[in-house]
Amino acid sequence: GMAGLNFAGNAVYRKPKEGRDNIAQFEFIPWILGQCATVQEARTLLAHINLVDTRFSEQFPTSQLHWILADRDEAITIEAVEEGLNIYDNPVGVLTKNPPFDKQLFRLNDYSYLSPDQPVNRFSEQLQLQLYSRGMGAMGLPGDLSSASRFVRVAFTKMNSVSGTSESESVSQFFHILGSVAQTRGCCRLENGKYEITI
């Protein structure tokens, strides 16, 4: 599967170049999925691509996006930026909006202490500290609505989730993972008076 997410302020598309596959950002997903069954096949196509700044309609600006592409074995993130086209291995298999993927992935280092297990008292052997709630191994997991925090949260959720044995259990688990980063109407107001929401 493949998805494009908002990448405002970072996406840079080029003018068409001879000898390259000049693809508009709105054509990118069907162009890849129409020709590739695996991420490896997509890597071959991406070696010749030039994402161009063609608008879908003169009424709308070009959508600034970055993409995640995944098959059952691996995932990559694709970003067209000022320096060129960056293709990153995506070991967590998730993506949110800004910042660029390499920064999002690096930020996971700040949360290496998180665990699905109950924590052990390392504060002091002289104190008898109590575990007063389940889930305390994940204390410090970001809960705000910024893209960077949502990336950490969904990466932790996905990497530690356990699916059941049936298809319906796996589908249910998938939607629980997505729910960990859902935007609720009213919690993130935009400058134009509208709200950032998850549909």
Model-predicted segments: where are they?
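Aromatic/basic-lined ligand-recognition segments
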Residues: 75-84, 89-91
